[in-house]
Amino acid sequence: DRRPNFVMHCGDVVDNGPAKREWVSELFGPCRDLFARSAVFPTIGNHEKNHAWYYKYFSLPAPEYYYSYRYGNAEYFVVDSNKSLKPDSEQYKWLDKALAASTATWKFCYHHHPCWSSDNNDYGDTAKGIRKAGDLNAR
């Protein structure tokens, strides 16, 4: 029986967050067996629209839109790139403290929007925010 130890999903698990049909039929229908056997650690995308179904169907560590978890000698940090990641934001402060406290050999951070984009729309200046973050990237 080959199965993943866990599933990381970078958001947009559905196309229209308020549409319950999409959660039930288009996500959980096809993924039922996989999700039943493996832990699922998503990050929220823009298509979920911060809808209550996301928080109802996924049981995530508080505050749910950003969190961390460990697997082996790795720690994973999940942030919501739909919300502010500026140095004075709640998420940034949490990530800064969490990275400093982490004893994991490997540290991974994931989110929905790309860090860099090949076009002029870099999704809310994500790349500029990352450049300002400085050593958060190197911890």
Locate the predicted segments by residue:
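Active-site metal-binding loops of divalent metal-dependent hydrolases
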Residues: 1, 11-13, 46-47, 81-82, ...
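Receiver (REC) domain switch-region micro-motif
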Residues: 7, 107-109
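N-terminal active-site segment of His-dependent metallophosphoesterases
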Residues: 1-21, 117-118
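Extended active-site neighborhood of metal-dependent phosphoesterases/phosphodiesterases
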Residues: 21-107, 121-139
